[in-house]
């Protein structure tokens, strides 16, 4: 870091060190290479602008910067066809007299006439000249110059800058063009053109990202997605020969609007004689003198076969989240074409999973998904819980000048539709899963270990370490509607001298029919579970059972009575005291302890103190479905909701199922690890 007090002095010294006109007069001389080293070929390199130097210089940022500042490529001025051109900013370089004398002294003792070294140098020079003489080099340079000048208060008189995501769209388009038009010189041209974009420190591996066959952009509303696509396509057609571009929109009027905008742009800035238009099929053909024509085809997703049989090098899919799903196969088919790239661009509508499918690409092996929003993942929870927050607090937010975001806009839009501010205006691409992700309390590594590391409860070692008491929780449901809640049961055994527990049994039981025998059916299911566990685990001597009585206290007592009669093991029940009579009934009223039980369960999972048994018992879950996987599905759905009184509530109900089995396992684990509850014999009174 340069101290601010010394900055002016250093700038003055730098200014004095630069000889007047020195940089303008300096140029590369190809016929006098500098032979700096006599090392073996493996330890040296031929630099086209210097000579033979040690290979370690390939990592020298100073050398790279100096060579690029005097590269003849950047001295060539290609005039733009339209608008006002932009100069490529090049960092000036200078060699002081002292440095020049030191360099000559280092090279003075080395023979400059080494034939082998001269051959290596000549080869490097020829390679450099070939890349500059590449037939598509000037064509691609013209495209960049024209696009830069078009965006310099020509396309929009109020602006000469673009947003970062718009620049990235240009990069994906331009660098893919390099890879298909000059594949052999692609890496060299990558290095040359990255100076145009200011990507001085970007390595070659990062640049390979732009050669991907597909990329996805999720960008908030009104941020200039279609605007920049129109500019790119217009300059592609008029600057690059033999390029075939496709544009697909989700609605016909959008495709027609883009089609008309591109036509007007070309007619305004380029000769009309070069343009050939077929409005009936949305095609534009542009032909420059002595060049092959380039074409554009605009289509909609409603005619899913409209782009079949076409050849596109670049296919832009606008508002891709809203494309009809039966049109996707014809679009994705272009990924099989070697020289084709699909660019999906869409706003975010995460209120509906069907119009948020592009966000699923966040798990792709390649870095395909680019999301623009105003909230980072670390602060999404703060954003959701605090009503006054409208942007991420962790960094200085960049908001385009044409975008207004404040608390009043948030309140107004959310009055129209709850969550509209987050999903539509803020561009929160993860909002479809925000409720799940924000409240996600169990880590994926913990679930993987819970699933894979199962305890062999049948081994003598495990049996010696397990307590002989089985804890069973029954959450009864008196309905035969399989779409609604069923009876959940969870059985847990604790380990001796440890906080560890093992889940040994789960049930999710639905009544076959609504009769007066529902209590008998539920009790029979619980008795069958205890019998199976007693058979597999002979060390279990008794069962401590808690039967939830929130739905029906009479039925809960009936279940306890029937289970007491049918259980193969001695059974003790958790009792609830009647405040009026003082009588204790064999049932449990679930209340505020549920949150504490969930917290204990979540902590046990994340700390790996809760496991499942290899021989886990379930008589009701399908044989084709692993009971542990069935339980993990419900664990993943656990959500923590803050309440107005400062407390929290836990729930795992989701659209695809209920949380009955999970609640039973959570409560069984809670009773197995807590010393606050006393289990007593059936119907024992105070």
UniProtKB/Swiss-Prot annotation:
Pfam families: DNA_pack_C (PF02499), DNA_pack_N (PF02500)
Main location (coarse class): host cell
Sequence motif: Walker A motif, positions: 219-226
Signal peptide: none
Motif annotated as Walker B motif, chain positions: 314-319
Alphabetical UniProt keywords: DNA-binding, Host nucleus, Hydrolase, Viral genome packaging, Viral release from host cell
Family: Belongs to the herpesviridae TRM3 protein family.
Annotated function: Component of the molecular motor that translocates viral genomic DNA in empty capsid during DNA packaging. Forms a tripartite terminase complex together with TRM1 and TRM2 in the host cytoplasm. Once the complex reaches the host nucleus, it interacts with the capsid portal vertex. This portal forms a ring in which genomic DNA is translocated into the capsid. TRM3 carries an RNase H-like nuclease activity that plays an important role for the cleavage of concatemeric viral DNA into unit length genomes.
Assembly information from the UniProt record: Interacts with the terminase subunits TRM1 and TRM2. Interacts with portal protein.
Record's protein name: Tripartite terminase subunit 3
Organism (species): Equine herpesvirus 2 (strain 86/87)
Gene: TRM3
């Amino acid at each position: 870091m340069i101290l601010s007090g010394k900055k002016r002095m250093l700038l003055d010294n730098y200014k004095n060190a630069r000889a007047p006109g020195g940089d303008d007069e300096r140029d590369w001389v190809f016929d006098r290479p500098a032979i700096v080293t006599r090392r073996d070929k493996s330890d040296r390199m031929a630099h086209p602008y210097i000579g033979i130097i040690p290979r370690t210089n390939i990592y020298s940022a100073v050398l790279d910067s100096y060579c690029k500042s005097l590269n003849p490529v950047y001295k060539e001025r290609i005039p733009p066809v339209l608008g006002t051109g932009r100069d490529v900013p090049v960092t000036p370089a200078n060699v002081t007299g002292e440095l020049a004398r030191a360099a000559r002294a280092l090279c003075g003792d080395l023979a400059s006439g080494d034939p082998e070294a001269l051959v290596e140098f000549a080869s490097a020079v020829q390679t450099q000249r070939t890349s500059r003489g590449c037939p598509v080099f000037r064509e691609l340079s013209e495209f960049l110059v024209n696009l830069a000048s078009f965006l310099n208060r020509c396309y929009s008189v109020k602006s000469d800058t673009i947003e970062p995501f718009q620049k990235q769209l240009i990069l994906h388009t331009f660098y893919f063009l390099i890879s298909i038009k000059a594949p052999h010189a692609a890496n060299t041209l990558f290095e040359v053109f990255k100076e145009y974009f200011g990507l001085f420190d970007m390595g070659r591996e990062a640049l390979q990202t732009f050669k991907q066959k597909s990329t996805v952009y999720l960008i908030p509303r009104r941020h200039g997605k279609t605007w920049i696509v129109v500019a790119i396509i217009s300059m592609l057609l008029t600057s690059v020969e033999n390029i075939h571009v496709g544009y697909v929109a989700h609605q016909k009027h959008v495709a027609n609007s883009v089609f008309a905008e591109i036509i007007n742009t070309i007619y305004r800035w380029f000769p009309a004689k070069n343009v050939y238009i077929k409005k009936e099929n949305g095609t534009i053909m542009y032909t420059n003198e002595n060049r092959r024509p380039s074409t554009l085809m605009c289509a909609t997703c409603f005619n899913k076969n409209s782009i079949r049989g076409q050849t596109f090098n670049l296919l832009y899919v606008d508002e891709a989240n809203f494309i009809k799903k039966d049109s996707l196969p014809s679009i994705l088919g272009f990924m099989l074409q070697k020289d084709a790239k699909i660019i999906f661009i869409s706003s975010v509508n995460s209120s509906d999973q069907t119009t948020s499918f592009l966000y699923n690409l966040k798990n792709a092996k390649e870095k395909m998904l680019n999301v623009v929003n105003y909230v980072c993942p670390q602060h999404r929870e703060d954003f959701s819980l605090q009503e006054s927050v409208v942007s991420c607090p962790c960094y200085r937010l960049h908001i385009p000048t044409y975008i207004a975001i404040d608390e009043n806009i948030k309140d107004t839009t959310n009055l129209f539709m709850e969550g509209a501010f987050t999903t539509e205006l803020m561009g929160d691409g993860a909002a479809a899963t925000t409720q799940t992700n924000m409240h996600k309390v169990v880590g994926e590594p913990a679930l993987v270990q819970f699933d894979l590391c199962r305890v062999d409860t049948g081994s003598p070692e495990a049996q010696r370490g397990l307590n002989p008491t089985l804890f069973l929780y029954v959450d009864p449901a008196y309905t035969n509607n399989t779409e609604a809640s069923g009876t959940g049961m969870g059985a847990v055994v604790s380990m001796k001298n440890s906080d560890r527990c093992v889940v040994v049994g789960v049930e999710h039981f639905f009544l076959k029919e609504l009769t007066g025998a529902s209590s008998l059916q539920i009790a029979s299911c619980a008795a069958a579970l205890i019998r199976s566990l007693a058979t597999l685990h002979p060390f279990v001597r008794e069962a401590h059972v808690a039967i939830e009585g929130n739905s029906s206290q009479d039925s809960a007592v009936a279940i306890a009575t029937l289970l007491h009669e049918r259980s193969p093991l001695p059974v003790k029940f958790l009792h609830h005291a009647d405040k009026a009579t003082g009588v204790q009934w064999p049932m449990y009223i679930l209340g505020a302890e549920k949150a504490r039980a969930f917290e204990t369960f979540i902590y046990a999972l994340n700390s790996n103190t809760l496991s499942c048994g290899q021989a886990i018992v379930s008589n009701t879950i399908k044989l084709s479905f692993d009971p542990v996987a069935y339980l993990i599905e419900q664990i993943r759905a656990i959500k923590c909701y803050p309440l107005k009184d400062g407390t929290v509530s836990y729930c795992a109900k989701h659209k695809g199922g209920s949380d009955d089995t999970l609640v039973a396992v959570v409560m069984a684990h809670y009773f197995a690890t807590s010393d606050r509850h006393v289990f007593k014999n059936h119907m024992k009174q105070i």
